[in-house]
Amino acid sequence: RWVFDGTAACAIPTDVSRAMLHGWYARNGVSLGNPKLGFVCTSQIVDGQHGLAGYFQEFEHELAPEERLRFRPGEMPPPFDEAAAPQLPEREWPVDRLIKAKRNYAIEYIRTGLPRLAELFGPVDAAFLGRIAGRVIGAQYYKAIAARIEIAPGGAAGFAHFMAALALGEGDEASVNVRGNEAEVERSGWRLARGWGDQPPELFEAWNGLWEGALMAHDRSLELAVTARQDLGDAATSWRIRPTSA
């Protein structure tokens, strides 16, 4: 259940959840250099069960690709023993480092997902699909995020500071310039895109949908315009927030 927020699991087909298991859990043995290690899934929340559950098992023979993941719905997995689970050394993993690791883990979903979207559907459709998804996500999560960083809804200045706060949280630099009822945000660095290599510029349009959606929830009388893009060679990425011309 931890993967999906609220009732989102209701919209996830079984095949999508199984694809994640095939691409991740089933390949842990390969990644660890142990071809006998496979994963047994005993439950999935998307199938109406108590949640994603299962266990890793070392078999007596090397597993073929189709054997690395097995489904045994209804089987009771071994109880979790917290005392036996690996523990991070506190001296090497202080709280600040753990917070950054969790942040980077979350970013990795988008960092790896957007290029795959372009591979599967092509750059133009990836921009459309990603942007629409981003707008919905941005709009849905704006209220909760804004409350956590103490941003009040309404006004260009407030949303500019919202964008800057999230940029700083991602490890980038950001500045805000407010002029009357308009505001500009300049963001240096795009941590999310590090390691992308040569990727189509349409991926930026997909990612930018998050900000468009958040702005709709913040103040629907405002519009967001991109005025510079670091991924296209500009020194930084900039946005202008102003009252809509419509």
Question: What residues fall within each predicted segment?
Answer:
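N-terminal accessory segment detector
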Residues: 4-20, 30, 34-51, 55-246
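Surface-exposed ligand-recognition segments of extracellular binding domains, strongest
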Residues: 1
